[in-house]
């Protein structure tokens, strides 16, 4: 039960714990510090609940969202929007790929001699990798990254991107890395929705 709940160990304190500050060092600490700095900059620039929501969308820092705003998002069924997942990953990848292809289209002679689609796909892959890292890499974010990256890698190797085979590869990787996710509604709904979209595209 603990494994499926994501609990690796439990314990207790003999006395009241004293918070002395973060002591983590290395790359993970540098990434977390960068996330917090970006979130603080967004809050200072926008301010209010809007700034907190923007910070959640950009770097996945949701702790500062006021309870009133969170409750309003829940009542309207929009709370999932601030959880970085497939929608956000697709927007990042689509924006970068579209921008790269638009820029390369300005140089038709050069574009005719180079694999523009592969360059754009690679740029999109780099962009969503950076977004995964800076957003904290939660479960839904990692799953969305995996599905998108499989499709982009397929483009790099001149394969069809939107196929059930690529979706199956993504599912197999998820099952190998985190098998307990298969029983969760998030995994089931995201893969079911993606399968429906891929099937509709093929039809």
What are these model-derived regions, one by one?
Residues 1-80:
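Membrane-interface helix/helix-cap signal primarily in integral membrane proteins
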């Amino acid at each position: 039960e603990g494994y499926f709940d994501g609990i690796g160990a439990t314990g207790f304190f003999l006395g009241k714990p004293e918070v002395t500050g973060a002591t983590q060092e290395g790359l993970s600490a540098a990434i977390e510090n960068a996330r917090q700095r970006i979130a603080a900059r967004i809050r200072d620039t926008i301010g209010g609940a809007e700034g907190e929501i923007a910070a959640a969308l950009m770097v996945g820092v949701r702790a500062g969202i006021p309870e009133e705003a969170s409750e309003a998002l829940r009542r309207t069924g929009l709370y999932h929007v601030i959880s970085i997942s497939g929608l956000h990953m697709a927007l990042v990848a689509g924006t970068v790929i579209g921008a790269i292809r638009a820029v390369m289209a300005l140089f038709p002679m050069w574009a005719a001699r180079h694999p523009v689609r592969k360059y754009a796909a690679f740029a999109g892959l780099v962009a969503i990798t950076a977004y995964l890292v800076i957003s904290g890499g939660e479960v839904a974010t990692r799953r969305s990254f995996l599905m998108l990256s499989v499709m982009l890698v397929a483009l790099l190797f001149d394969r069809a991107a939107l196929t059930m085979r690529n979706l199956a590869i993504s599912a197999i990787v998820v099952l190998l890395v985190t098998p307990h996710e298969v029983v969760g509604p998030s995994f089931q709904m995201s893969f079911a929705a993606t399968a429906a979209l891929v099937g509709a595209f093929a039809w």
